[in-house]
Amino acid sequence: MINMKKEDLRIIFLGTPEFAVESLDKLVEGGYNVVATVTMPDKIAGRGHHLLQSDVKKYALEKGLPVLQPTNLKDPAFVEELRSYNADLFIVIAFRMLPEIVWSMPRLGTFNLHASLLPKYRGAAPINWAVINGDKQTGVTTFFLKHEIDTGDICQQRSIDIDDNENVGSVHDRLMHLGADMVISTVDSIIDGTFETKPQPEGEFLPAPKIFKETCKIEWNKPRECVRNLVRGLSPYPAAWTDICDANDSVSTLKVFETKLCDDLQSEQSLMPGDIICTKSRMAVMCADGLLEILELQLSGKKRMTTQAFLLGYKPKACK
């Protein structure tokens, strides 16, 4: 049993996006001793080339926490600075793959919060892929780091059900809150010596690779439920997309945010995948096994809108 109060446990927190901030906030507001944070370097963004700070950095500065932003995690100067904090525990959430010289540094080890029920969905985009694949359940896992990515011994897991109409934004937010609670629970179990770990099962499991632009392209020759799940799994960001032709055969990019299965629109002609049926206020696209109605969308250069608003100024012909 570790004989110390939570105020005496020196923690370094490593993370970047909003998903990580929720856990950091729980630690800080809960009186845990976060002695430093590590996050990505600022990025140049926008036409004005402004420096964009990570969500973790913004929060850390608000709370007066030290912020380390290494470009190279193996840089001797960074490693030495990290070591100077004499931390007992590292917590990693939505950061980068850590070298052993970093994750092996604290005496109590380094644990990670991962947004899946490991060993399923190891990789960069676990929430997206759970929804894209039509899973009915997902969750969060805390585990201790070792050499292979996302393969360490599991500390705790908690699960949630995924609603059939839920998009990845909603699942992300629920897992963010659930994960933050579990981070606290994991830290508490380490402090009081009640934590237990178990190895991850061996075998082949669905991965969660990084999402690229081509990952997001809709293939209308797939079953409509697969297309609907792709849209859900990428909404609101980065969003599924398709090329769309208007009545003049001009091609534009169309982002699709919300869809539903459609069985009440009919066509007098036989339809091929990508063909469109429209009324004054509705638009559906033919998939391999039926029509999928688009409810919310965004044409390139325009704002996000309902299909009804879109059809006031656009005459679609087909999707590609």
Report the location of each language-model feature.
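N-terminal Rossmann-like dinucleotide-binding module
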Residues: 2-47
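Short active-site oxyanion
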Residues: 9-12, 86-90
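Conserved beta-strand segments of alpha/beta enzyme cores
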Residues: 10, 33, 64-66, 109
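Donor/substrate-binding cores of folate-linked one-carbon enzymes
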Residues: 18, 29-33, 40, 89-210, ...
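Structural motif corresponding to alpha-helix initiation and N-cap regions
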Residues: 21, 53, 75-79, 96, ...
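N-terminal glycine-/serine-/threonine-rich beta1-alpha1-beta2 phosphate-ribose binding loop
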Residues: 44-88
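Internal anion-binding site segments
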Residues: 202-320
